[in-house]
């Protein structure tokens, strides 16, 4: 049995060192896969921004048309009628100060997304040490601090993902599973790239997308030609 190192080397040899159209890259990524599990497919964008400057930070959310292959577990922190709305919309966990206390005392994080109403943020804000490092802190910019908790829950369940630049200017987001039909992965990736293009800060000068790569958990990275998608996003 070949070692993983030899397997990834064999996979890399089947990928040419050139940018591929998404429609060609996705089937190639699926062809060279060797892992025995259903890998996550990720898209990484290298942007021509300086994240040290607040006016060049790229951040946003987008609902991927075909989801991510798994339903996210959603926690809603609210009170009164908003709790009932969240439950009706399909939230997995719903509570108020009791949930805040549980997270603070136990470091509880058995969920994928947290939605809060504005009135609860005074308490939720104290959970920064637990939620912050995991990217779970509710934020108005990503639609997770809202009075419309029902819509927020439905969007997250439908495949809403957040994207933001890290300190090196990279955006790294999952776009589905390797088992997805190729056209669904192409749709999801195109939707993400389009959203990132539309989120370009006015302060960013020069070439915006400097590189784009599609990869799976264990597989090689494939360079993507985003020219056509960028042009369509601006039209």
Curated annotation (Swiss-Prot):
Sequence similarity: Belongs to the universal ribosomal protein uL1 family.
GO MF annotations in UniProt: rRNA binding; structural constituent of ribosome; tRNA binding
Pfam families per the UniProt record, alphabetical: Ribosomal_L1
Domain of life the protein comes from: Bacteria
Signal peptide: none
Protein name: Large ribosomal subunit protein uL1
Oligomeric and partner information: Part of the 50S ribosomal subunit.
Cited Gene3D superfamilies: 3.30.190.20, 3.40.50.790
InterPro entries: Ribosom_uL1_bac-type, Ribosomal_uL1, Ribosomal_uL1-like, Ribosomal_uL1/biogenesis, Ribosomal_uL1_3-a/b-sand, Ribosomal_uL1_CS
Keywords annotated in UniProt: Repressor, Ribonucleoprotein, Ribosomal protein, RNA-binding, rRNA-binding, Translation regulation, tRNA-binding
Function: Binds directly to 23S rRNA. The L1 stalk is quite mobile in the ribosome, and is involved in E site tRNA release. Protein L1 is also a translational repressor protein, it controls the translation of the L11 operon by binding to its mRNA.
Residues forming coiled coils: none
Organism whose genome encodes this protein: Koribacter versatilis (strain Ellin345)
GO cellular component, one term: large ribosomal subunit
GO biological process terms held by the UniProt record: regulation of translation; translation
